[in-house]
Amino acid sequence: MIMTRNRRVEKGFTLIELLVVIAMLGILAGLLIPAVSYGKFKARVTTCTNNYRQLALAATMYAGDDSKGGLPSFQLPTDSTQLTNFHNLYPWLIGLPMLKAMETHGIAQPQMWYCPLRKRWQDNSTTFQAKFGRPMATIDDLSKFFTDIQKSKYGFVDLNWWVPRRLEGPTTLTYPDASLLPTRLDTPWPSKMDDLTISTRPILSDWMLGSKDTSGDSFTSATGAHAFGGKIRNANSGYADGHVLTHSASSMKWELQVTDGENSYIFY
């Protein structure tokens, strides 16, 4: 008798089946990668929001220690040609002593002055590392970046600081002043905790600069704020009463015209 053995024939993937699997994996990757990227974007927006809460709280604590309840406001130098007649004077310029004043109220990390959704912190810290051979890790380092690398007498922070501050010297002018500048609203930005506008006018907002719609208050094109996929999605603003608002792109409005007569505006 001849014995026969039944063998199970194992069948592998055909070429067509393999191509179908690869195509399905490609589709899944195409769906998952944008979702993961958007998740990272939202996480960074949350980090920015938390940073603004800490900055607003530090400003409130500073005002609590001030005899007149004044919010952080340090003079800007007037000997710079950039400040003549408010030309090239912007709300992201602050007096350098403000950095140390806010440090004593909890803002001890230099990256707190930079938006986590933009590259300015990475660029500036890389420049500092190349110059001094060490990371930019302290507020003193941040001040050194402005004075020794940028050769500046004031700080260029990665946000707009709206608390009015005096210009140095005998002048009584302050910046920003809603009564002297082309602004959308006539109400002043708060300078003290008892001002009526502490819950309606922000003391800080995301850096955003662009052109305005001629028929309205929204922007047509802009840079800054929180962008994803090549489009601005939202921007944060923080208030002296402690709350932070995240404005969608469709709800943003211009607040300050940078140079009179030009289509260049700051939005939040």
Residues covered by each model-derived region:
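Acidic/polar helix N-cap motif
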Residues: 8-9, 51
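N-terminal secretory signal peptides that target proteins for export/translocation
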Residues: 1-8
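N-terminal single-pass transmembrane signal-anchor helix
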Residues: 9-40
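Juxtamembrane interface helices immediately C-terminal to a transmembrane segment
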Residues: 31, 40-51
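Short, well-structured segments within or immediately adjacent to enzyme catalytic domains
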Residues: 46-268
